[in-house]
C-alpha cells in the first residue's frame, strides 16, 4: 500500500511524493484496521522509526481538514515538545496552525484555541484538565506519545489523571496512544476502549548483543573507534552526569576527527565553564543536565546533521525519553543506575529496549547495533538472559497514596468549574483510571483510601465536606488555588505556612526577611531539585539572620544559594568555580524557581500578605532575568538581558525613558550593543514610554 492509495484530499501539497512512498507494515495494518475511517481510539505499539508518528499526524490532519477538528499532541518532555513543534510547523504550517504550550500551568491558555494542532507536555495537559477551559471540549483528537510513561513513578499519575478526566468531560475525543515498549498493550487498549496495532517490524534490522569488556574501558573505546572510522555515529549511555563527561574525555583522547563544522560548534558551546568545546573539536560531546539549553540544542543539531558533525555522544539515561537522536550503534556502558532511596539497581528491560530502539538510522544504515557491556563471562550470561532474551516489564499504574491525593484534589477542582462534585463522582473518576482497571478486586480498598484522603484534605484546608450532607465535597479557595498553580499538597502547605510565618516575623518581631529567606522558602517545595553546594550552611549564615529558618530548610540550602548568586548577577563561570554547579543545573534551578516564585506571590495575595506578595513579585522578575533590583526597569525593554542592562546602567542609563532620549552614538558605545543594536534598542525603549 502506498501513501497515494489513501484519501489525502487537501494534503497533496504536503505529500507531493505520495505515489512513491510505500507504507510500512505497521502503518498499513493500522490503515486497514480503520485508523482513518472510524472514530475509534487506537493504541499503536511498534518500534522506534516504524512510522507511528506519521499515523498520528494523518489522523489529526484528516480531522482538521475534513471535520474542522482541533488536536492535541502530548509528550513527556519540554525538549521533545519543541522538537515536535518545529517538525510539525515545517511540514504542515501551510495547511494547519501549529502551536505549543509547555508551562504557565495556572492559565487556561485561551490563545491556544486559535491553533489546529497544539503540542504540549503531559503536565500542561494535566493542568488544562483541572481548569477545563471551554475550548478543550472542542478537541477532536488527543495523541499521547510515549504512553508507557504511565508506568513512571513521577509523571505517570499526572498523565493517567489527565487522560481519565479528559475522556470524562469530552467523551467524543479520539485518543491515539503511541509507544515502542509496552508489553501489556492489550490491557491499555481495553482501558481506552481502543483498537490495538502491535508490531515488531523495524525499517532497519537491529542486532542486540552483550559486549564483553573484561579488560576495562579501553576495549569499549576501541569498539567505538571502529564504528567512527567506518563513518558511523555512536550513542554511549553512562549512569551518571560526571561519568558521561569523563567517558567522553576518554573517547576524545583516541579520536582524530576534525572539521570546520566541529570548530564552529566548539565556539557555540563554549561558555567558559569546562572542556566541552575541546571535546567537540574531536567529534565527541557529553549530553546531560549540566548542559545549558543552548549548548544542548547545538549538540543535538550537529549530531543529526551527520556528515562533518559530531560522531559520539556520551549521555545519561534521560536521553532515552528525550529528543530523536538516532545512531548506527547504541552502547550501554553501565546498566546499573543510582536511584535515591534504593541505591544502585539494574535498569528495567523496557528502558534498555527503548535505548536500543535508537540504533539504526533509516536511509543511512543497513542495520543497527545495540550493545550492553559486561565485565565478566558470568555477567555476560546474566545480561543476556535478563536483557537480550528477557521479558519486558508490564506498564503498571503508579497511583500511590500521594499521587491519589493530588489527583483527587485536581478532580474536585475540575468539578468546581461546572456543577461541583461529591464522593460518588470522585469514586467514579477513580474507577475510570488505569489503576482501577488493573486493580478491580481492590476497589473497596480504594474507596477506603479515598475517604481517608478526603478527611486529610479537609483537615488541611484544601476542601470542605458539608456537615449536613457528607457526600458533598467542595474545594476551598486555598485548595482551588493550589491545584491550579500545579502545586503538590505538600508544597502548597509549605508556601502557606512559610509566607504566614515570614510575614508575622517581619511585622510582629521586626525580623529582617532577606531575599535569601524567600528563596529558601521556595526551595523547600517538592518541585525544586536540591543542589549540593560545599559549605552551604556557612554561606547561608552570611545571607540570613534567621538561623531557625535556615536549619528548617537545610536540605534545600544549595538551590537557594545558587539562585541568590544568579540574582546577584554572578556569571556561569563564576558560579561553576565557586559552587561546582553547571549552567544547565543553574538554568533548571532558575526556571523552576521562577514558577514557584510566581506561585508564592499568588499564594501571598490569597493570604492577604501584601508585603510578601510585593517582595515575591519583584523577586520573580529578578529570577527571570538574573539581575539586581536596580536593573528591573531596563530589562523591561524588549531584547535587553542582564548583560546589556548592566552595560546601560554603568553608562548612566537608569530606565527606559533615559534610553529613549539618548543619541544613537551614545548607545553604540555600550558594551554588547554596537551599531546594529543601538537603533533597535532606542525604538524598543520608545515603545515603553
Go through the PLM ranges and name each one.
Residues 329, 336, 348-384:
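Conserved segment of the helicase C-terminal RecA-like domain
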Amino acid at each position: 500500500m502506498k501513501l497515494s492509495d489513501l484519501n489525502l484530499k487537501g494534503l497533496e501539497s504536503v505529500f507531493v511524493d505520495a505515489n512513491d512512498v510505500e507504507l510500512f507494515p505497521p502503518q498499513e495494518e493500522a490503515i486497514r484496521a480503520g485508523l482513518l475511517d472510524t472514530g475509534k481510539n487506537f493504541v499503536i505499539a511498534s518500534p522506534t522509526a516504524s512510522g507511528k508518528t506519521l499515523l498520528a499526524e494523518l489522523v489529526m490532519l484528516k480531522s482538521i481538514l475534513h471535520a474542522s477538528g482541533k488536536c492535541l499532541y502530548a509528550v513527556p518532555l519540554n525538549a521533545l515538545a519543541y522538537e515536535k513543534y518545529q517538525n510539525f510547523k515545517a511540514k504542515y504550517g501551510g495547511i494547519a496552525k501549529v502551536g505549543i504550550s509547555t508551562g504557565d500551568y495556572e492559565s487556561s491558555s485561551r490563545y491556544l484555541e486559535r491553533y489546529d494542532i497544539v503540542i504540549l507536555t503531559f503536565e500542561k495537559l494535566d493542568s488544562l484538565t483541572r481548569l477545563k477551559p471551554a475550548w478543550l471540549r472542542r478537541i477532536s483528537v488527543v495523541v499521547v506519545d510515549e504512553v508507557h510513561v504511565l508506568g513512571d513513578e513521577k509523571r505517570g499519575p499526572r498523565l493517567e489523571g489527565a487522560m481519565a478526566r479528559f475522556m470524562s468531560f469530552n467523551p467524543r475525543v479520539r485518543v491515539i496512544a503511541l509507544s515502542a515498549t509496552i508489553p501489556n498493550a492489550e490491557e491499555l487498549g481495553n482501558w481506552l476502549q481502543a483498537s490495538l496495532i502491535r508490531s515488531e517490524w523495524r525499517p532497519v534490522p537491529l542486532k542486540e548483543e552483550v559486549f564483553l569488556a573484561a579488560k576495562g574501558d579501553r576495549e569499549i573505546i576501541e569498539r567505538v573507534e571502529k564504528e567512527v572510522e567506518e563513518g558511523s555515529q555512536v550513542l554511549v549511555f553512562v549512569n551518571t552526569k560526571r561519568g558521561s563527561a569523563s567517558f567522553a574525555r576518554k573517547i576524545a583522547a583516541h579520536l582524530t576527527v576534525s572539521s570546520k563544522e566541529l570548530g564552529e560548534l566548539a565556539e557555540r558551546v563554549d561558555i567558559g565553564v569546562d572542556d566541552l568545546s575541546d571535546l567537540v573539536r574531536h567529534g565527541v560531546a557529553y549530553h546531560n543536565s549540566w548542559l545549558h539549553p543552548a549548548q544542548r540544542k547545538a549538540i543535538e543539531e550537529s549530531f543529526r546533521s551527520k556528515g562533518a558533525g559530531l560522531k559520539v555522544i556520551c549521555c545519561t539515561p534521560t536521553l532515552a525519553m528525550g529528543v530523536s537522536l538516532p545512531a548506527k550503534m547504541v552502547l550501554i556502558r553501565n546498566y546499573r543506575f543510582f536511584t535515591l532511596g534504593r541505591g544502585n539497581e539494574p535498569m528495567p528491560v523496557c528502558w534498555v529496549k527503548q535505548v536500543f530502539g535508537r540504533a539504526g538510522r533509516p536511509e543511512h544504515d543497513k542495520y543497527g547495533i545495540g550493545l550492553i557491556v559486561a565485565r565478566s563471562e558470568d555477567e555476560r550470561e546474566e545480561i543476556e538472559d535478563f536483557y537480550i532474551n528477557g521479558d519486558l516489564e508490564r506498564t503498571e499504574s503508579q497511583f500511590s497514596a500521594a499521587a491519589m491525593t493530588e489527583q483527587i484534589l485536581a478532580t474536585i477542582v475540575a468539578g468546581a468549574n461546572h456543577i461541583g462534585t461529591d464522593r460518588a463522582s470522585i469514586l467514579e473518576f477513580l474507577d475510570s483510571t488505569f489503576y482501577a482497571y488493573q486493580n478491580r478486586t481492590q476497589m473497596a480498598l480504594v474507596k477506603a483510601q479515598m475517604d481517608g484522603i478526603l478527611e486529610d484534605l479537609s483537615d488541611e484546608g484544601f476542601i470542605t465536606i458539608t456537615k449536613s450532607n457528607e457526600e458533598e465535597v467542595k474545594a476551598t479557595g486555598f485548595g482551588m488555588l493550589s491545584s491550579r498553580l500545579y502545586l503538590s499538597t505538600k508544597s502548597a502547605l509549605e508556601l502557606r505556612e512559610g509566607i504566614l510565618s515570614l510575614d508575622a516575623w517581619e511585622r510582629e518581631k521586626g525580623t529582617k526577611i532577606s531575599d535569601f529567606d524567600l528563596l529558601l522558602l521556595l526551595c523547600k517545595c517538592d518541585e525544586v531539585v536540591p543542589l549540593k553546594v560545599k559549605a552551604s550552611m556557612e554561606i547561608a549564615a552570611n545571607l540570613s539572620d534567621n538561623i531557625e529558618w535556615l536549619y528548617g530548610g537545610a536540605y534545600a540550602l544549595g538551590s537557594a544559594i545558587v539562585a541568590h548568586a544568579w540574582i546577584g548577577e554572578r556569571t556561569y563561570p563564576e558560579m561553576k568555580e565557586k559552587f561546582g554547579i553547571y549552567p544547565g543545573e543553574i538554568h533548571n534551578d532558575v526556571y523552576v524557581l521562577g514558577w514557584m516564585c510566581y506561585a508564592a506571590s499568588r499564594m501571598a495575595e490569597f493570604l492577604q500578605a501584601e508585603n510578601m506578595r510585593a517582595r515575591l513579585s519583584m523577586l520573580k522578575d529578578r529570577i527571570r532575568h538574573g539581575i539586581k533590583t536596580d536593573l528591573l526597569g531596563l530589562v523591561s525593554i524588549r531584547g535587553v538581558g542582564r548583560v546589556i542592562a548592566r552595560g546601560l546602567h554603568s553608562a548612566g542609563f537608569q530606565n527606559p525613558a533615559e534610553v529613549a532620549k539618548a543619541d544613537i552614538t551614545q548607545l553604540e558605545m555600550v558594551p554588547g550593543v554596537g551599531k546594529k543594536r543601538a537603533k533597535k534598542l532606542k525604538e524598543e525603549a520608545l515603545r515603553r514610554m
